Amino acid sequence: MTVILPKIFSGISNVRAGMSTRIGNESNTEIGINLSYNVGDNPTRVGRNWRKFFAQVGISEHDLAVPLQCHSNNVLKVDTPGEYRECDALITNTIHVALVVTVADCVPILLFDPINRAVGAIHAGWRGTIGLIVKRAVEKMKAEYRTDPVQILAYIGPSAGVCCSEVGEEVAIMFGNKIVPYHEKKIFIDLKNENTLQLLQQGVLGNNIEVSTSCTICEKELFHSFRRDGQKSGRMRAVICMMQ
Ligand SMILES: [Zn+2]
């Protein structure tokens, strides 16, 4: 299975992080490697892919904390594995609690505070981005764990690039002056950049932010894309976990 390992966390022995793709030799189906039970894929195969992915990142499948994402801007502090409703971001300072994000175009963001030892995982689509969910996650890490943003290492993962993020006027209005006029009469938003700006405004250092250049819509061999493939699109997972 092809797994993306963020460079920003490489060399740090007590944190593990990764993101799945749709490539792997287990996938002899059209959908490719998929980690969601809710898109019509064979549950046995999804389970096998699920275990393989987390094993490859070095995380136990019993340690997962999974937000049941709803395009909110709610950030939840968790101390145990499990499923969590009504939220799109989790933070923890507990080892062996692996924070999971589920995506297919939306932006997965992973945060690590190596000084006060805390992590965060955020799902930011355009609604979450407008709702400043990344800003709220950093604020909650500051409040709960005394995190200094200057120390945070951040990963902004593969997601819809500005190249493919054309929006209608109703979304553009909500983004205000943040829209990117790309072609005449078309309006584009740049979610990776918006979330990067939220981190910078919170005091995270530019050198401490790794931004994936991959576009999930353009790179169809490697990534699932809801916008490209619709309801039956597979899903990818990103995860971060502190170890002993
Ligand atoms: Zn693209």
Question: Which stretches of residues belong to each language-model region?
Answer:
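Active-site microenvironment for binding and transforming phosphate-containing groups
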Residues: M1-Q244
